[in-house]
C-alpha cells in the first residue's frame, strides 16, 4: 500500500474536501450560493455568461 493509496483514501462526503469548482475542479474560494459551486476566479470569468450583471 503506497503513499498515494493512503493519502486520499478517507471518504469525503461533506465539508470542504468534498466540494470543488465545476469549471476547474479547484477547492479554494468556492462560491456555493444559489447552487453555483464555482470558484471565485472562474466566477469572474463566466459571470456574464451565467447571467450576472455588474451594477453601476
From Swiss-Prot:
Gene3D superfamilies the record matches: 30s Ribosomal Protein S14, Chain N
Matches recorded under InterPro entries: Ribosomal_uS14 (IPR001209), Ribosomal_uS14_CS (IPR018271), RIbosomal_uS14_euk_arc (IPR039744), Ribosomal_uS14_sf (IPR043140)
Pfam families attached to this UniProt entry: Ribosomal_S14
Cofactor field: Zn(2+)
GO CC, alphabetical: cytosolic small ribosomal subunit; ribosome; rough endoplasmic reticulum
GO molecular function, one term: structural constituent of ribosome
Ligand binding (Zn(2+)): 21, 24, 39, 42
Chain segments annotated as transmembrane: none
Free-text remark on how the cofactor is bound: Binds 1 zinc ion per subunit.
UniProt keyword annotation of Ribosomal protein present: yes
Localisation per UniProt entry: Cytoplasm, Cytosol; Cytoplasm; Rough endoplasmic reticulum
Subunit structure: Component of the 40S small ribosomal subunit.
Family as reported in the entry's similarity comment: Belongs to the universal ribosomal protein uS14 family.
Protein's recorded name: Small ribosomal subunit protein uS14
Organism: Lonomia obliqua
Amino acid at each position: 500500500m503506497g503513499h498515494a493509496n493512503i493519502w486520499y483514501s478517507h471518504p469525503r462526503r461533506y465539508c470542504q474536501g468534498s466540494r470543488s469548482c465545476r469549471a476547474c475542479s479547484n477547492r479554494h474560494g468556492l462560491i456555493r450560493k444559489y447552487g453555483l459551486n464555482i470558484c471565485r476566479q472562474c466566477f469572474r470569468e463566466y459571470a456574464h455568461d451565467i447571467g450576472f450583471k455588474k451594477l453601476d
